[in-house]
Amino acid sequence: MKKLLTVVSFFLLGIILSVGCKPAPDPMLDMLDTQMSSLKKDDLTRTMEFVYSENRFDQGQFQDKVSSSLNRWAQVDASEETIDSWTLDSFAKSLIDQYATLPMIERTEEISYLNSDAYYLQETSWMNQLTQRIVATPNPKLFEIYRLAAGDFETEGQEEDLLAAVMKRIHPELDAEQATQLAAAAKVFDWVTRNVQLTELVDLSDEQVEKQRLNPEVADPAASGTPGAGYQHFPWQVLMFSRGDYIERAKTFMVMMKLYGLDSVMLATKSKGEDGEMVETLWCPAVVVGGEYYLFDTRLGLPIPAGTPVKMATLSELKKNPDWLAQLDLTPEESLRDDTKYWVTADQLDDLVGLVYVSPESVAKRFHLLESKLPADQPLNLTSQPSEMIKRLPSKEGLKMKAWNVGFETHAYRQAVNEAVKKANEEDVVRNKLSWYFTNEAYINDFTLYRTARAKYFAGSFETVRGDAKANAIELFYALMYDDDKIRSLGSDQGLQRLLGIYEEDSSLLEFRQRIESVQAQMSLVRRDAGYFLAECHVDNGNVGTAINWLDRLRATPGDNRWEGGVNYLLGRCHEARKEYETAIGIYENDQKSPQFHGNVIRARMLGQLTGSEVSAEAAPEIKPAPSDN
């Protein structure tokens, strides 16, 4: 199947590059623009309507529309505005200086907007809406392991925040507000763990680096377009693609914590490298609640336990009880793999670094002005003041703070990728280096309906509103599960063509045929993802039984196993939610190929300790890849 996928991807690559024509005007974008004009909305209000809309648009036209509208607003409506209080944050200045040649950074002190600013607005809107939804939704079934740790706490009839009540029992040292905050952090962390399938860190040899480098004239890995750990995707892309390494999970979680109102830092350990220089290794996010740093390991997919199952460790407690880290090693009975040791040791706790996430947009003058002028019914937390946050952070012995450059690295990397994509049609070497882009991203960027379904999922659009003809997320993902007949019919089905943004009258016959072939190739990739996202919808909507049916179906369907780790983990979580503990434990322990295997085994261990469950042969079926069709 992997061979087949490669063929499809390179076919798609060739079609996309050969079409070469300017896309037809996005009718949905034009319709919304016309509607806003008729209502005499000002440029800023109209811009935010585009950003907040659940409907997604042609990517290029969306960013052009948003940036041009913002610049028009800045020149006309905001031309007399001043923000004398703005100064470049002192804590971020070193990063601004380091990346001064990036177009994004060159405008830090200007009131003018770039095309890429549209995606930052979209990212903040999505993550703000998503964070509020996650925190507000009880969904107690998903936190069964916490309920068990709270002494088999009975949640029926509870009117308060159920997880906050559970947290108060597990952590009696917290007051009610702190328990609510820790519960919110746990909910968001759990959502990120379930919805961002963990991928392995990119670890290239020197030879591989030279082969992957998109711009051989640039030495910096990110700026040269060389894939690397943590910086390949913006947080909004991590959400859209539903995949990321543990660093990308971490920064996504930390941005959501900021939007909720909690401070966090990324902890890093220090050790000597082969050349004798000190090397920092990223570890885990630490969220501040009640003056303490609570540790959430995005590689494990679990908070660091405080010696007993599920109870969350603080950094202060861990330093007093460093043996807790050794309890995260896997035993020979649990795994015979070589990498059974936990990746942080007790001696590393004495010299930690706290990295403060900073995005270049959040400290820019233009976004400070924009945030202050947003309509009252369209507020967004677009800015940050890292130097003020540093003052708020608890002072702990041995923890030194510094600005984290990963947000700047992502901009540098994506600039290199975007420039390379423009050259791919003419340069075979560049085109071959970008095969990952056309396999994993291009079809999503070009498929508006796919992105609309994802946006509706982030918003929690699961129910059909009476009298509203708009499809919800579940209905859209169903619609995206195209069968072979539907894909073949695209060439003659004008209704489907228009739904997917194909208009014969706007192109030559050759361009039209190439566009049909391109979208047909995309449809075969889209349906692979839609089934998995449909299961995610049902889990978020509390229908774990329905989710199990879909996940079992996905495991039995021939495919390239792109979502294998996520499917198995989500399936285990669903059985855990239904109190089918032995089945859940068996799934966690047997998914040997998952990058999250270590954490899944720790989860299985804790679940077994809390329930006294043992895995039977029937309850722990071997996890096998979906059958191949080649």
Where in the sequence are the language-model features?
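Secondary-structure boundary elements
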Residues: F50, D64-F241, E280, G290, ...
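"A position-specific structural signal for the A-helix of alpha-solenoid helical repeats
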Residues: D529, F533, W563-G566, L570, ...
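Hydrophobic/aromatic-rich core segments of domains that either
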Residues: V166-V196, L201, A223-G230, W236-K341, ...
